[in-house]
């Protein structure tokens, strides 16, 4: 069963900044980056407990190909995943 994913304003800004950075390096690279982010989030939504808790209730998911981590919190009671940060490692 899938969950709802909600982006924090910080995560949305970080994602936009990273997309712009990659897209400015090479046309289409930003789109490729977003596709890998989407695949990672889809995995999280389908398997919210698929990554270990790292700090308290927060979990970290590595993005394939790109050196990024997605930090999220899973609230089981309302089946919601809060994406808190998307950052370069």
Q: Which residue stretches match the model-derived regions?
A:
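Basic, Lys/Arg-enriched alpha-helical interface segments
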Residues: 1-58, 76-78
